[in-house]
């Protein structure tokens, strides 16, 4: 049964960050930056500070050292000439910084730890299915893995879309580590901000670069709007959280923002269930960050499999519905 119109009309944004040190990106265009500001990426140099000279030199000040907040160590905004820094999420609604979490459609945050080297169904509906592949690191002092999302496998109609982060030893933000395929064929996009790829098989689907490397926006008209960015675990992240990152693997993973249109009231999955009109949050909301269990219900046999216990994909002829909405 379809969700009531009042619910369908309100497009919910789900921000996804999994069980390590991810901050999620907004699934909506960024508004213009404030005047006299610069975005810096000190994380690529393995530290949170960066020396810069602001464009406005009338005050004849010496170059200042800008320090990104620990909520956003790899990217932040510097206001000139004060050299004060802010996380981008302080300016852009819908973005999230800080502790790893899912943010459900009901507005509540929760962890889903999952397990490394396994796939889990994040959203499963009649005409849309999204799995996430987890990578991880085991800390001997803990009973679970540190986990991150390395890739998404998206099924709609008879198509398969793969969005992934390539395994990377030494991180270089100027090298593109995105891996994108549609129905098994590579998606190649010119390395310029705003460059766009459009599917010939599904013209309503576009992939647009949001940065010259490692960031894209994937849109399927009337179905979803996804922002992804490949990021590493930095030495600082590893030191603070005891991730024990080694030189042979920077644990490159995805920061993800989801925006969905027209999910039905039968939707399920780790996140999908929070969109149901009858969803009841049974997590311990008094905890600093509730943890969703029930891993067995969400395990998929591979990145594109629709065999998790709560799968809804293809039910009630829904596979053809997405094509109609996208045209």
Indicate residue ranges for each PLM-predicted region:
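Cleavable N-terminal signal peptides of Sec/SRP-targeted secreted and luminal proteins
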Residues: 6-25
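Intrinsically disordered, low-complexity eukaryotic regions enriched in glycine, serine
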Residues: 44-46, 58-59, 184-185, 191-192
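Von Willebrand factor type D
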Residues: 90-327
